[in-house]
UniProtKB/Swiss-Prot annotation:
Highest taxon above the source species: Bacteria
GN (gene name): ectC
Described function: Catalyzes the circularization of gamma-N-acetyl-alpha,gamma-diaminobutyric acid (ADABA) to ectoine (1,4,5,6-tetrahydro-2-methyl-4-pyrimidine carboxylic acid), which is an excellent osmoprotectant.
GO MF, any single term: ectoine synthase activity
EC number: 4.2.1.108
Reaction(s) catalysed (UniProt annotation): (2S)-4-acetamido-2-aminobutanoate = L-ectoine + H2O
Entry keyword Methyltransferase: no
Species the sequence originates in: Aliivibrio fischeri (strain ATCC 700601 / ES114) (Vibrio fischeri)
Entry protein name: L-ectoine synthase
Length: 128
């Protein structure tokens, strides 16, 4: 059995931050569950370009509001209780609105190792 708290993970190397977001990676590839689980905060009044060419992701909004814009497609509002699934390696822009950051629960397949950050194209590489 694996038991971890968000606070424990936040105060460790499992917390990764960039200019527009931070991710607390609670479950990683080396946990051997076949997926990874993160609590990600999208900072207020930001836009992040993301394109997971190597991963599928499902995201559940726990707090805050914003939107996701699929490149070449539609824009969808995000608020608490919204689940979106990037099942086609969808290139997208994730935006948190001015008044509050968004806190999201994220699941990745294949699982990430924990060291990944988005490259210049918004992609996470596949790491062993």
């Amino acid at each position: 059995m694996i038991v971890r708290t968000l606070d424990e993970c936040r105060d460790s190397e499992r917390r990764v931050a960039s200019e527009t977001w931070e991710s607390v990676r609670m479950l990683l590839k080396n946990d051997n569950m076949g997926f990874s689980f993160h609590i990600t905060t999208i900072y207020q009044d930001t836009e992040t370009h993301i394109h997971y060419k190597n991963h599928l992701e499902s995201v559940y909004c726990m707090s805050g509001e914003g939107e996701i814009e699929v490149v070449g497609g539609e824009t969808y509002p995000i608020k608490p209780g919204t689940l979106y699934i990037l099942d086609k390696h969808d290139e997208h822009y994730l935006r948190a609105y001015k008044d509050k950051e968004m806190v999201m629960a994220c699941v990745f397949n294949p699982p990430i190792t924990g060291a990944e950050v988005h490259d210049e194209n918004g992609v996470y590489p596949v790491l062993d």
